[in-house]
Structure formats: structure tokens, C-alpha cells
């Protein structure tokens, strides 16, 4: 087990799982490339999409970390990368706050896109938040529908 101070910046960085951010950035990059090829590329909406996708990926990682710990799925002796809540690096209460303080900025940043795409985008943002939770939580977690997690370390 790594020696990491409880609720430290290092603990939060490990909980954010930076290696998974490529999975959030790739579809945005593809969309930006398609917009560029069509002559419609704009820097601000592309940057906003990158920030929103990255924050939602981090929020999903925090949610996964918290609920797997609470359900006992992730334990201190788990195989694979260590998880922050299971290791005691971040308390469940602090992780709940981390989820809130990641989703709220994601939604505020994402709301800039309403000026480009209209109010219908609110539904897309809402679905992003819902599926971030349903990946790990609920009666039929999405993470259990597949045999592997390609984006995980």
C-alpha cells in the first residue's frame, strides 16, 4: 500500500484517475476534427467540450470509487490499481463532496454550450450526470454489463 496522506492533493489526483481522461477526450477530439473538416470548428465550444468531458469523467471515477467502496466491491486487498476510498486515502464524506464539487463546475462550464446549441443540450448534460451515477450505482450497474473496462488502468 502506498503511503498517502488522507484527503491530500495526491489522494485526489489518484482518485481522479488521469489515465482515463483520454477516454473522455477522444470523442471530443473526433467531433472537433469533424467540425474542422466541415469548416465549422470554433475554439471556445471545443475547449468547453473538453473541460466538460474531463470533469464528467473525473466525477464518474469519484462516483465509482465511492460506491464500490460502500458496496464492498473495492477492498484494500483488491487486484489492480488501488482505490482512494477503499485505501482510506479519501473518506466517503469527502468523496461525496468531491463528486458535488466536480459535477457542479462541469454543468456550469457545459452551460456555455447552450449559446451554441440551444436549450436541448440540457437533456444531454442531464444524461451525462445520470449515466455517471448509473455506471456503478442502481439495481443494474452499467459496469456489470460488460466483461472488461477498457478505459481503466
Locate each region found by the language model:
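Residue-level signal for inorganic ion chemistry
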Residues: 16, 68, 91
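Acidic (Asp/Glu-rich) catalytic motifs at the cytosolic membrane interface
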Residues: 55-79
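Membrane-embedded alpha-helical segments that form the functional core of polytopic membrane enzymes
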Residues: 39-63, 126-129, 133
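Topogenic membrane-insertion module of multi-pass membrane proteins
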Residues: 1-44, 48, 52
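Membrane-interface elements of multi-pass transporters and channels
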Residues: 36-41, 66, 70, 119, ...
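Membrane-water interface at transmembrane helix exits
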Residues: 31, 35, 39, 64, ...
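Intramembrane alpha-helical segments
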Residues: 5, 83-149
Amino acid at each position: 500500500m502506498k503511503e498517502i496522506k488522507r484527503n491530500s492533493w495526491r489522494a485526489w489526483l489518484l482518485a481522479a484517475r488521469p489515465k482515463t481522461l483520454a477516454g473522455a477526450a477522444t470523442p471530443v477530439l473526433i467531433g472537433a476534427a469533424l467540425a474542422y473538416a466541415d469548416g465549422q470548428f470554433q475554439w471556445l465550444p471545443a475547449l468547453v467540450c473538453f473541460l466538460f468531458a474531463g470533469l464528467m469523467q473525473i466525477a464518474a471515477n469519484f462516483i465509482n470509487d465511492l460506491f464500490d467502496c460502500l458496496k464492498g466491491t473495492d477492498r484494500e486487498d483488491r487486484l489492480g490499481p488501488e482505490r482512494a476510498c477503499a485505501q482510506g486515502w479519501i473518506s466517503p464524506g469527502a468523496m461525496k463532496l468531491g463528486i458535488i464539487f466536480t459535477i457542479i463546475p462541469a454543468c456550469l462550464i457545459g452551460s456555455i454550450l447552450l449559446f451554441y446549441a440551444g436549450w436541448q443540450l440540457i437533456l444531454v448534460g442531464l444524461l451525462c450526470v445520470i449515466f455517471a451515477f448509473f455506471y456503478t450505482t442502481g439495481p443494474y450497474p452499467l459496469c456489470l454489463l460488460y466483461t472488461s473496462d477498457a478505459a481503466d488502468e
